[in-house]
């Protein structure tokens, strides 16, 4: 199999920054993982230099086998009951005004880890009541009860990524369901209309423009408020290959289309990831809350 050469627009220049070391030290201090590190995010240095990070809770081993993802697969460890407190302390130490919490998928747990998410939200609110909280959740096998546990803890944004277009699910997300992911987003709005919902799509996996636009329409029909669109980068030769490096102009086309169908916030670009510059939604959240 031949591999595509990365275009210039995907090349990143890394600058030394003391703030990056500070973030790494704080994460070590509280024994926390970040999806930035586990998923080899290309924006890790930019985000760490701004003292932002996406916390990865419930361990670093996933029970699913998505072919695009670099997070470890296998048998997960027992939940750490102190983790919600440690996350809250790290948020305080970093002085975050906006925090994103995500997790591996824990199909081994009765509620998929929903109660652990809820406890993390409550712990942060107790320590940093003015910090906005975004949670990027797994599908919880489509459990309304599990989604309710998270929503009832009152995060500001509940995100769940569809990741790719429907046709590619069997080869990219074999243990997931496109319809179920859309249903999760619908559930959030059914439980609490005031909570913002968000999703993310990767491109370059072999989809067409029309399929991406159809996925965006499906998200809007599920009342999704925010969306991110980014280039898929294969972690290794053992993962799903990159079929295409999508030109920045196409990302702009997707952004314009997403805005035209009603998304309140759109991030679309080659290096965009689901939590990239998530703090930019803070003003939108605060302005809508005032209405």
UniProtKB/Swiss-Prot annotation:
SUPFAM superfamilies: Radical SAM enzymes. Its EC number is 2.8.1.8. Pfam families: Radical_SAM. Residues 48-264 form the Radical SAM core domain. CDD domains: Radical_SAM (cd01335). Its cofactor is [4Fe-4S] cluster. Pathway: Protein modification; protein lipoylation via endogenous pathway; protein N(6)-(lipoyl)lysine from octanoyl-[acyl-carrier-protein]: step 2/2. The keyword Zinc-finger does not apply. SMART domains: Elp3 (SM00729). It catalyses: [[Fe-S] cluster scaffold protein carrying a second [4Fe-4S](2+) cluster] + N(6)-octanoyl-L-lysyl-[protein] + 2 oxidized [2Fe-2S]-[ferredoxin] + 2 S-adenosyl-L-methionine + 4 H(+) = [[Fe-S] cluster scaffold protein] + N(6)-[(R)-dihydrolipoyl]-L-lysyl-[protein] + 4 Fe(3+) + 2 hydrogen sulfide + 2 5'-deoxyadenosine + 2 L-methionine + 2 reduced [2Fe-2S]-[ferredoxin]. Transmembrane segments: none annotated. GO terms for cellular component: cytoplasm. GO terms for molecular function: 4 iron, 4 sulfur cluster binding; lipoate synthase activity; metal ion binding. [4Fe-4S] cluster 1 binds at residues 36, 41, 47, 275. Its main location: cytoplasm. It is found in: Cytoplasm. PANTHER family: LIPOYL SYNTHASE, LIPOYL SYNTHASE, MITOCHONDRIAL. Belongs to the radical SAM superfamily. Lipoyl synthase family. HAMAP family: Lipoyl_synth (MF_00206). This is Lipoyl synthase. It comes from Caldicellulosiruptor bescii (strain ATCC BAA-1888 / DSM 6725 / KCTC 15123 / Z-1320) (Anaerocellum thermophilum).
